[in-house]
């Protein structure tokens, strides 16, 4: 089996072939997801909430993400594997490169960073040193204290225009992929069409090139508040996890998910 690479994702964008991605944190689930057809996985700092029980992603460390990245890589050796750089792990150039290198050594193919134009020097520095970068705009959970909670971003025209500029700046700085979270579908379409790099949405409508969900949301096992954009695919699959993942993939590829009920206007 051939490994999935960024060249595949770029080709899928050109072909307008939508693709489904998930978070994963251990070898068993990573293997199961890959066997059902998931080709891109993210070891997200969401592990702080889903696995460690915190109320935000802020306490997560690079060592935490590296630990789970090693496990996921062993379970899914052929998937394109992204790893989140946690809060304050890319504050200085030296710190950024050391932490990114740790995640790449753990098995990541790409690191994901949250932030806009101010992050361009960091993205450029990593790209020049052969570390592929995925950007993350919209609702960036590491900025929860600035946003005052988990809120939809880019609804006002000024904010929407700035987000588009940030996306283009990150692409120009060398980002190869972009995650767009909790933005109005119209803005998501503008960004997706403006960029040559693939855009993965979460709470951004069905207009992006790909979709991602936290695995716990896709399987309906999230405790507490459930995001509007989430869908319990397990409940629609008679409790069969494999069938649930296949259904998720099918609905993303067909454009059936996310539906209007999962989308912000």
Swiss-Prot record:
Domain of life, source organism: Bacteria
Cofactor binding note: Binds 1 Mg(2+) ion per subunit.
Primary location recorded for the protein, binned into one broad class: cytoplasm
Oligomeric and partner information: Homodecamer; pentamer of dimers.
Protein name: 3-methyl-2-oxobutanoate hydroxymethyltransferase
CDD domains: KPHMT-like
Provenance organism: Yersinia enterocolitica serotype O:8 / biotype 1B (strain NCTC 13174 / 8081)
Binding-site residues for Mg(2+), renumbered to this chain: 45, 84, 114
Leading EC class: transferase
